[in-house]
Amino acid sequence: MGQLEEKTALITGAASGIGRAAALLFAQEGASIVSADIDAERGKDIVNEIERLNGKAHFVPCDVTRADHCQNAVEHAVQRFGGLDILFNNAGIIVRQSVVELGETDWDRVMDVNVKSIFLMSKYAIPVMRSGGGGTIINTSSGWGVVGGPQAAAYCASKGAVVLLTRSMAIDFGPDRVRVNCICPGDTDTSMLRDEARQMRREEDEFMADAANRPLGRVGTTEDIAKAALFLASDQSSFVTGTSLIVDGGGLA
């Protein structure tokens, strides 16, 4: 029996990267998956892939910065699969600029996608979890939510906010048997990381080689992060809440 049998997991940003890897792994472990993403084509692709593997999945279009979309995603989970046990708030973006270079629109966009989305999804998910006897929420922060990084002011601010929002939620809803934790990935091989090379006007190969400069000598894979998310989603972490799990190959050691 899989670790997530008879569980329903709602994953934001499930169309690609870490979210996609988590959707596949969670489904392999028995969970029914709600793929929530603004990218309908790739969001549906992951559903089709899960169904080809005899899993259960459903796609819901979702702009995570909009309250009505977040509420709709939670309602779809309940209507389709009968409840909601796991929420993986994974959608995120990065803009590599300092506060001087950064425009107000980009600041707002980063904060909305990276932080406001967690507030909105959790606002609608927690009452469902509470009525069902509990659940678990995983928020994606970053190593740069623990320490600062260069030319990433809005990103660092947003990911630091995720760490403390996670702790606050864990305190508030622990009595309701809702656990809340966050993952702090280091550099992980995704399209978002590779896009940073473009933003920084650097050659991609050189940028990725620098990103691998850590004790384990490589960047992370999406599967590395998905496995950490699985631990936090499963009963293996039943006494873990309010924590930040750093998964970075020793980058912050």
Label every PLM stretch briefly.
Residues 98-99, 106-108, 210:
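Substrate-binding pocket helix/loop in short-chain dehydrogenase/reductase
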Residues 100, 147-153, 175-176, 217, ...:
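Active-site loop immediately N-terminal to the catalytic Tyr-X3-Lys motif
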Residues 122, 158, 166:
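Active-site helix of classical SDR
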Residues 127, 171-175, 238:
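Alpha-helical segment proximal to the catalytic Tyr-Lys
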Residues 142:
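Residue(s) in the substrate-gating loop at a strand-loop-helix junction
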Residues 147, 230, 241-253:
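Short C-terminal tail/terminal secondary-structure segment
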Residues 175, 187-213:
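A glycine/serine/threonine-rich, flexible loop-to-helix segment
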